[in-house]
From Swiss-Prot:
Subunit annotation: Interacts (via C-terminus) with the spanin inner membrane subunit (via C-terminus). Part of the spanin complex which spans the entire periplasmic space. The spanin complex is composed of spanin inner membrane subunit and spanin outer membrane subunit.
GO cellular component, one term: host cell plasma membrane
A Pfam family matched in the record: LysC
Presence of the UniProt keyword Membrane in the record: yes
Coiled-coil stretches noted in the UniProt entry, renumbered to this chain: 54-78
Function field: Component of the spanin complex that disrupts the host outer membrane and participates in cell lysis during virus exit. The spanin complex conducts the final step in host lysis by disrupting the outer membrane after holin and endolysin action have permeabilized the inner membrane and degraded the host peptidoglycans. Host outer membrane disruption is possibly due to local fusion between the inner and outer membrane performed by the spanin complex.
One GO-annotated biological process of the protein: killing of cells of another organism
UniProtKB keywords: Coiled coil, Cytolysis, Host cell lysis by virus, Host cell outer membrane, Host membrane, Lipoprotein, Membrane, Signal, Viral release from host cell
Signal peptide: 1-24
Full protein name: Probable spanin, outer lipoprotein subunit
Protein localization: Host cell outer membrane
Record organism: Escherichia phage P2
Primary localization: host cell
Amino acid sequence: MRTKIFAAGTVLTCLMLCAGCTSAPPAPTPVIVPNACPKVSLCPMPGSDPQTNGDLSADIRQLENALARCASQVKMIKHCQDENDAQTRQPAQGAD
């Protein structure tokens, strides 16, 4: 006796649907953490064309100030990202 193809397909579909009726623990609710950190912007470095030692000294001070401003921007963004990471990990630790 030969089984028709559509009958086998219908039976397999029913078996697959029955497997989906088993009880399983509910999936944890995903935690959405918005990225509220400021955007990274370029850190402009001042150009220089020193003619005297005094000009060179002034250029060095300008460069040091520009680097300090850039470092403070990077530090602020790093701190913001660390806070976001901590908020993301908190619900996962509380679920245990």
